[in-house]
């Protein structure tokens, strides 16, 4: 199988980060990476572009790490309260979504709903949760569900 060198323009899971030079199958590059704008073909003249991308990625990583540390300080150990409709037995009509938790956290810090880890919430009570703010930084908090 033929392999080709490509330069990633965006982070691709299980492959690399922006600015990395990686070897991939020619079909994967031609049919997925190039059309999606995730990579371009490697050339000797592209070394300057690689250096610029790596510099930009490093600067962004430092900024996002500092933002994540500030967000962790605001979120860590807090409790967010969410009101929901409940039956007489105390069970929720539906459940509490990660989007609802992210909205409740929005006054403390902006978080990605996909980064929130919490067990399935189907009753009222307190539930431990975690949010990944950065690959190295997570914050723990509690979700309190009360009857509406």
Curated annotation (Swiss-Prot):
InterPro entries: Ribosomal_bL9 (IPR000244), Ribosomal_bL9/RNase_H1_N (IPR009027), Ribosomal_bL9_bac/chp (IPR020594), Ribosomal_bL9_C (IPR020069), Ribosomal_bL9_C_sf (IPR036791), Ribosomal_bL9_N (IPR020070), Ribosomal_bL9_N_sf (IPR036935)
GO molecular function: rRNA binding; structural constituent of ribosome
The keyword Ribosomal protein is annotated on this UniProt entry: yes
Keyword RNA-binding assigned: yes
SUPFAM superfamilies for this protein: L9 N-domain-like, Ribosomal protein L9 C-domain
UniProt-listed GO biological process terms: translation
Keywords: Ribonucleoprotein, Ribosomal protein, RNA-binding, rRNA-binding
GO cellular component: ribonucleoprotein complex; ribosome
Function: Binds to the 23S rRNA.
Family: Belongs to the bacterial ribosomal protein bL9 family.
Protein name per Swiss-Prot or TrEMBL: Large ribosomal subunit protein bL9
Classification of source organism: Bacteria, Bacillati, Actinomycetota, Actinomycetes, Bifidobacteriales
